[in-house]
Amino acid sequence: MMSSVSTESKLQQAVSLKGVDPETCMIVFKNHWAQVVKILEKHDPLKNTQAKYGSIPPDEASAVQNYVEHMLFLLIEEQAKDAAMGPILEFVVCENIMEKLFLWSLRREFTDETKLEQLKMYEMLVTQSYQPLLHHKPILKPLMMLLSSCSGTATPAVEGKLVVLLNQLCSILAKDPSILELFFHTSEDQGAANFLIFSLLIPFIHREGTVGQQARDALLFIMSLSAENSMVANHIVENTYFCPVLATGLSGLYSSLPTKLEEKGEDWHCILKDDWLLLPALVQFMNSLEFCNAVIQVAHPLIRTQLVSYIYNGFLVPVLAPALHKVTVEEVMTTTAYLDLFLRSISEPALLEIFLRFILLHRHENVHILDTLTSRINTPFRLCVVSLALFRTLIGLHCEDVMLQLVLRYLVPCNHMMLSQRWAVKERDCYSVSAAKLLALTPVCCASGITLTLGNQERDYILWSKCMHDGSGSEEQLLPETPCSPSSPSPPPPPAPAACIVEYGKALDISYLQYLWEAHTNILHCMRDCRVWSALYDGDSPDPETFLQSLSEESRENSGHPEARLPQQSVRTSGQTKDKSQSELEWDDSYDTGISSGADVGSPGPDDEVETPAPPAPIDPPKHIQEMKKNAILLFKGSYIEESDFQDDVMVYRLCAEKDTEDTTEPQKDTSEPQGDTLEPLEDTSEQQEDTSEQLEDTSELQEDTAEPQGDTADPTAEAQPKLQPEAQSLPTSNGPLSSPDPETESQPSRESSDLCQNTFSEAKPENEPGVALALDSELIATTFEAEPQSELAVVSTESEDFIAQYDQIIQELDSGTEGLTEQSIPISEPSLLTQQEERREECKEEEDDDFDSLMAATPAVEAGSSPFGVGEDTAFSSRHPVRTQSTPFTGPFISVVLSKLENMLENSLHVNLLLIGIITQLASYPQPLLRSFLLNTNMVFQPSVRSLYQVLASVKNKIEQFASVERDFPGLLIQAQQYLLFRVDMSDMAPAALTKDPIQEISRPESDKTLLDGPPRVLQPFLGNRAKVTRAPPNLPLPVKNTMLAAALFPEFLKELAALAQEHSILCYKILGDFEDSCC
């Protein structure tokens, strides 16, 4: 009937009734209606017994159509004065014309064509009329009847026109909420779904194409309306399936996503908008996820709460959690990439919160999702790169909950540092000592050649020049520069040899100035986001003691609620059973929070006076944790993995201290056979043999590295050890002889780090040794001295010499073919070295025994750990200082695995290294003093079992130098690697402002994602971009050599980036979080 309405209305829009007499229009309207009524009554069975259903002559149907078209035009163009109805509209309402026309359509064959005519007619009325027609029930009721009759249709044309009309109606409702009550009352006859418009839109929520988009837009109008109208909100929550359909629809759409993605090249590490726009199934899912985000943003709190609950319990837990644990690596990698994409696409905090809750708190098969994701960083597949990209996204959120679970919860107790170092957490490095030490790690073999700068900086680049400060005799030392303006006045003379000063007029590294600017921007951006955090995390807030208690209480409260339980809070017992292997003990300990209520509980020692609660029952580590441990051994043999204590030489000394406690509490055991408790667990599994041999290898490596710089002797390792031990033992008790590296540390005589670091700079080198060699070795000495002296101090046992010798003998017998690092093999410690250690310790035994109690009080965290070898059921470590109970020092699995991966920098692929660098610089940009001091303060003295970023960087430096010493064409290969990295960036794709913004975010992220994840900008990161243009082929080298050279090219830039962050923190750390707006540009 109304097939030509749309076309003719466009032609009639040019005709205006302005100036025409309203009475004339009314007369015309009534005449047309009279003609229509004659035809309607003729075919009305109630008034004409001869009328037949559906048999209407075409000419009469066409006549009705023409009359109705003119009538609608007159009604639409009528303009009423004031609030009164116009005469035509009043006539339509009184005569119930719209309902009669609808019944006329029903008498005919109610085909899809008839429905289309009716839908078009109402679309014209509601969109073009000057009067509010929907306020009148005689017009609204037939409209609702028409919509109801179209609800079950499956014709695309009718569905499209129906959604268009519904969209228009919702738009009118949003503008004029007074109509809303009429819709509810009018649709009371429609059953449970008495808000018919809303109910009709629900089936189209997840529809693809224009129809789905228009339906979602219409629903958003109603969602915004619900925020101000609790009646609508209550109806949607109680009487509709909107939230369940939305959440379960996500599950259905996710099941249709590809389980494996196409190969995108070695650069691929995350899904970008350009990628998912090519996948229709992913486009459909992202549209629905974006709609969920929009609904939560504008809807009533009741709807928001119900929706996030359904998404969590209807999509994340039953669908995404199992998908993250698929069998094949490709499926797991794809799911991880999807999760990263979802996080980058969500902007509404309530929706983001449940995704983060899922990652941080949910347990799948008794293993936390966060543990699973962390373990995958240690995989050799592309899954590692995708997992790193996910963590980059998480850290870039600047979310307190994320950082608390990843890092801060392990740093808050402050048991990773020496007790005397607490004051240094908030220390301000005014003289850039940390930056100087970081820059001094630059290998000499990498100091020449080009530097990685962006293309438009290349012409202006000035080669980095080192300052040689002439000292007395042969104490010439290579020092890095501190950027400052060449035109500025000459700086004052250095306060100590360790100061970092640039000479007046020296050339500066342009790229370093860029790093400084980026660091300044990153830190301010992070400070702005952290203003809302609940604590400063500065060692005092939150209070370490109350934090320990709160987590212990929370662990007990949440023990019966797996969903709300915090991750990595598996309760660890100090007394482990004898039949539990060492590998299980180590890995189980690694996933302890370090602050659970039973961490320090066990058989009381002789000095324990305070009663402690009984420990909970032991919990066997899940298979997943055991697999993580095996992967760590297989993939990173010989490298640093903190949580497994692979290189922790103080492990042996802890066992000796434990033996003292065991001998006191269990005198019936024969102390003359100290190896008895360790033989059984050592023989349990072959994996354990690998573990213990690794520990001995790393101990040997540390001893060799420490001994190298001490002199030119035939056997420097053997001769240096007796010289180092007395110095190490005297450090904590004698602060006077060593001068402080700068005025700030001179005013802190009790600071152990000053002694340890100054020992490196003030020690004179032999005259026949090159100055460059001293500069290289000095950093290694600083690294090893920060861990070794405290390890030596922890050796307090009358049986320790015997035990160490027998332990060494056992390991050498069990595993004689231990492999070393990829680039070097580390020999087992010679018995002669241990013999010399024993002799030296015999001489100092009395003094050590006298000082035992004081030393253990100063380092309380060392005593509270269970033995890594396994002990008797009734034997455990007990605190020597019960007033301050501490757990085994541990910085958390995430930090541990990231540092272990970084230490293998030379073996990693380029993309792994770039992501690792990005994550570490993200972490180093946080203003929280605990995190800042742990990563960037090179003078901090940590517990012997805790390895710092500075020590890992020193290890990487040594590996690079060792490789350079055996690679004849190292300088040429280095230049090739640097050029290859430079040409990876296509500067034509970058905006000029990209140098002051995050290159990864600006290049890689779609426009819709940039509002949420504004991660810290990094100069190095353009080399990682998916659009990086490789204009030159990489050097044609074997893969291990290629990876090593690319890592050697990145390493100096990484050091400059960290040094710049350290310097900028020294400027900005005095600012209160929130008092920095004036510094933002």
Curated annotation (Swiss-Prot):
InterPro entries: FHIP (IPR019384), FHIP_C (IPR045669), FHIP_KELAA_motif (IPR045668). One of its GO terms (biological process) is protein localization to perinuclear region of cytoplasm. Residues 486-496 have a biased composition (Pro residues). Residues 553-564 have a biased composition (Basic and acidic residues). Residues 474-496, 544-623, 658-770, 863-883 are annotated as: Disordered. It comes from the Eukaryota. Residues 680-707 have a biased composition (Acidic residues). Residues 567-576, 727-738, 746-762 have a biased composition (Polar residues). May be a component of the FTS/Hook/FHIP complex (FHF complex), composed of AKTIP/FTS, FHIP1B, and one or more members of the Hook family of proteins HOOK1, HOOK2, and HOOK3. May interact directly with AKTIP/FTS. Probable component of the FTS/Hook/FHIP complex (FHF complex). FHF complex promotes the distribution of AP-4 complex to the perinuclear area of the cell. PANTHER family: FHF COMPLEX SUBUNIT HOOK-INTERACTING PROTEIN 1A (PTHR21705:SF6), RAI16 PROTEIN-RELATED (PTHR21705). Belongs to the FHIP family. This is FHF complex subunit HOOK-interacting protein 1A. It comes from Mus musculus.
